[in-house]
Design a protein with these regions (language model features):
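Glycine/threonine-rich beta-strand-loop-alpha-helix active-site module
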Residues: 3-99
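Carboxylate- and glycine-rich phosphate/diphosphate-binding segment that chelates Mg2+/Mn2+
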Residues: 73-172
Length: 172
């Protein structure tokens, strides 16, 4: 596991490369890497994260959708307990997020569609939030507009770099 390797080599930081699931796994492991606890203790059992046990993470996303590269939330599945829950803590924010649209050029159309709709869902959720700021509403509207304009283009022509750039922009 990520956590086991981090502890074996006494990692000072980690680089997560991928979409939402690999990002979330790495965030959870980084949050407790210097300690001796198990992820389940924090994820399923509610143990508090000690920021002194965390190591920094660099997030390199290969999709445009989950926004995991810029959040402090990690959604994991505990298969033994049949639970899918979020864990979150300020220690889980990636220190650096690298969003390079060229890394999304090989994403299959069905993943492009589902992550693109995830971007739209995030934009609508942010816009409709009970507590929000006007700047957030403006960003949400802008993001939704980008999705409506560019998602179909990215889906129909996966190697359209401009469409991929605009979807990456919409996702953050």
């Amino acid at each position: 596991s990520d956590l086991k390797i981090m502890r074996e080599i006494n990692a000072d930081f980690a680089i997560a490369l991928g979409g939402g699931s690999p990002m979330d796994c790495c965030k959870a492991a980084c949050a407790i890497a210097k300690g001796d606890g198990k992820i389940r203790s924090y994820h399923s059992e509610g143990k508090a994260i000690n920021k002194d046990e965390a190591i920094p993470m660099i997030a390199v996303t290969t999709t445009s959708g989950t926004a995991s590269e810029v959040t402090n939330i990690s959604v994991l599945t505990d298969v033994e307990k049949n639970l899918k829950n979020p864990m979150n803590d300020p220690a889980m924010y990636p220190k650096i997020a690298i969003i390079d649209p060229e890394l999304t050029l090989t994403v299959p159309p069905q993943v492009t569609a589902s992550t693109g709709l995830d971007v739209l869902a995030h934009a609508i959720e942010s816009y409709r939030a009970t507590i929000h700021q006007p700047i957030c509403s403006a960003c949400s509207i802008y993001s939704a507009r980008l999705v409506f304009e560019w998602l179909e283009k990215a889906y129909n022509n996966p190697f359209d770099l401009k469409a991929r750039e605009k979807m990456a922009e919409a996702s953050i």
